[in-house]
């Protein structure tokens, strides 16, 4: 099935020519009246105009959030939970509309938005609706007349900055725990993908009290900087590049507020020789696990962009992988058969191509792809790159630097010790993949790899209730787990004496 382009006959969605900031429960124009035009990666054509917001717009959103904070924080857990469940239902009821919107905004294949991004977004709201209902404080008996009560309280007003690679899903990852915990939010989307959150707000805005959720569009150096440096937020959460994340952490330190940052990665995907003695279905699964590096066009922080294959199985296993690569269907992202879509922006498109040049200069062997994906018709102006496999070594820049595109560096190893050394030879530690039928090896390697998540005999699963976050320069904090509620709460200790007698010091 091929979905009609938005705004054309038969389309499931039509966009407005101009959107505002969402502040205090309504869309409003930017204070200075400035806008920027966003284009679709699918065809390089304009989508709509969005506010080029400034510090004044951030302050306006913070005014609305602070005005709503006390009432929302006092809203019962049951009511907050029910609102999150209604948000999940509304998302699910508008699956196709949101999936097509996300594809048009980001360029990713609609098969992914239909089956991953949007369903997972709904599920995360449901998950945290359940978590907040189940969360308990504690009471500790200090002695026979003194009790320590520990109570969860919301932080108040928090800032969130989301990336362009999974705009709606990353919004759900951050909004669900923050709202569940009783916080009001000022959120800034990436300027490359401002559309999806606007369409979502049109669908769910009536479910939340005005001021609880506010969205300010604009550029990172203007609106994002103003939000991150504001003295009126109690926490900042960010997903994006490591250099920007480092700056966010400095801003948080200056304001003495907590921060959660999910940053870059250069994830190893390790294949041991015993997989080739497994069932044919498992061998195919393992090959797919390597090709999953092209999921979302490689624009994933945990992209398994370093494939480590044991020497003894390299020829046979890579033939299975190349069969999968040759079978990848490229083309119109609105076609449900398309597996790899467009890169999210021209800037990212050019960055990836520059790394393909670097790989050639470094002497990497080209196994597949390596160039622009030339499409015809309306897609000719889109940002398409061939899924690319490069054979090389871990010292190359294409193995060490985050490319954030459909580019995988493949290398070999002799034994377990060498595999672990190569895997950990990176400044990042967000994710890793591990493929073996030896359960003891799986445990040893899983514990030895310095990464926040180690997929074992699988890859790119992102269920709620599986903690997600990085080691080293891949970030601070964890998401997609009930522990995230603690990140959006303060702990109040009530230390109560039930003894009528004085202490006796004075």
Curated annotation (Swiss-Prot):
Q: Could you tell me what induces this protein?
A: Induced by growth on ethanol.
UniProt superkingdom = Bacteria
What are the EC numbers? 1.2.1.-
Identify the keywords attached in UniProt to this record, alphabetized. NAD, Oxidoreductase
Molecular function GO labels: acetaldehyde dehydrogenase (NAD+) activity
**Is the NAD keyword given for this protein?**
yes
Does the record carry Lipoprotein as a key word?
no
Which example biological process does GO assign this protein? ethanol catabolic process
| Pfam families, A to Z | Aldedh (PF00171)
**Residues in the active site?**
262, 301
Q: In which pathway does it act?
A: Alcohol metabolism; ethanol degradation; acetate from ethanol: step 2/2
What reaction does this enzyme carry out catalytically? Answer: acetaldehyde + NAD(+) + H2O = acetate + NADH + 2 H(+)
User: What family name appears in the similarity comment?
Assistant: Belongs to the aldehyde dehydrogenase family.
Function comment: Catalyzes the NAD(+)-dependent oxidation of acetaldehyde to acetate. Is likely a component of the ethanol oxidation system that allows P.aeruginosa to grow on ethanol as the sole carbon and energy source.
Q: Which PANTHER family does the UniProt entry name for this protein? A: ALDEHYDE DEHYDROGENASE B-RELATED (PTHR43111:SF1)
Which named protein is this?
Answer: Acetaldehyde dehydrogenase
Organism of origin is Pseudomonas aeruginosa
Recall the taxonomic lineage recorded for the source organism. Answer: Bacteria, Pseudomonadati, Pseudomonadota, Gammaproteobacteria, Pseudomonadales
């Amino acid at each position: 099935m091929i979905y009609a382009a938005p705004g054309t006959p038969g389309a499931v969605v039509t966009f407005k020519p101009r959107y505002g900031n969402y502040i205090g429960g309504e869309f409003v124009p930017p204070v200075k009246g400035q806008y920027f035009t966003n284009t679709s990666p699918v065809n390089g054509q304009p989508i709509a105009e969005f506010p080029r917001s400034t510090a004044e717009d951030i302050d306006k959103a913070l005014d609305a959030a602070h005005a709503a904070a006390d009432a929302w924080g006092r809203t019962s857990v049951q009511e907050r939970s029910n609102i999150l469940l209604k948000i999940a239902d509304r998302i699910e009821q508008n699956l196709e509309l949101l999936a097509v919107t996300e594809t048009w905004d980001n360029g990713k294949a609609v098969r992914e938005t239909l089956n991953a991004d949007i369903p997972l977004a709904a599920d995360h709201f449901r998950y945290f609706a359940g978590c907040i209902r189940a969360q308990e404080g504690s009471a500790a008996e200090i002695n026979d007349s003194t009790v320590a009560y520990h109570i969860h309280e919301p932080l108040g007003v928090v800032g969130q900055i989301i990336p362009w690679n999974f705009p709606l899903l990353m919004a759900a990852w951050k909004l669900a725990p923050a709202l569940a915990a009783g916080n009001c939010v000022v959120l800034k989307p990436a300027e490359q993908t401002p559309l999806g959150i606007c369409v979502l707000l049109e669908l769910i805005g009536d479910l939340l009290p005005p001021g609880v959720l506010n969205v300010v569009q604009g550029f990172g150096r203007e609106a994002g900087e103003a939000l991150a440096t504001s003295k009126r937020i109690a926490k900042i959460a960010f997903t994006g590049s490591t250099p920007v994340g480092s700056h966010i952490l400095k801003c948080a330190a200056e304001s003495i507020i907590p921060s959660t940052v999910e940053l870059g990665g250069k994830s190893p995907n390790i294949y041991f020789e015993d997989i080739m003695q497994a069932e044919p279905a498992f061998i195919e699964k393992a090959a797919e696990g390597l090709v999953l590096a092209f999921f979302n066009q490689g624009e994933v922080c945990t992209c398994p962009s370093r494939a480590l294959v044991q020497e003894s199985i390299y020829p046979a296993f890579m033939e299975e992988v190349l069969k999968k690569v040759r079978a990848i269907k490229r083309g119109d992202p609105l076609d449900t058969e398309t597996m790899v879509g467009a890169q999210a922006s021209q800037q990212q498109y050019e960055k990836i191509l520059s790394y393909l040049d670097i790989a050639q200069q470094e002497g990497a062997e080209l196994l597949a792809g390596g160039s622009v994906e030339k499409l015809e018709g309306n897609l000719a102006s889109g940002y398409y790159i061939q899924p690319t496999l490069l054979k090389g070594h871990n010292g190359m820049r294409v193995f060490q630097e985050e490319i954030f595109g459909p580019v995988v560096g493949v290398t070999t190893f002799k034994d377990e010790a060498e595999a672990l050394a190569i895997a950990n030879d990176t400044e990042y530690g967000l994710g890793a993949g591990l493929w073996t039928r030896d359960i003891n090896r799986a445990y040893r390697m899983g514990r030895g790899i310095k990464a926040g998540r180690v997929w074992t005999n699988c890859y790119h699963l992102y269920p709620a209730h599986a903690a997600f976050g990085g080691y080293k320069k891949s970030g601070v904090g964890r998401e997609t787990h009930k522990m995230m509620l603690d990140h959006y709460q303060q702990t109040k200790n009530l230390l109560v004496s039930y003894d009528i007698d004085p202490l006796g010091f004075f």
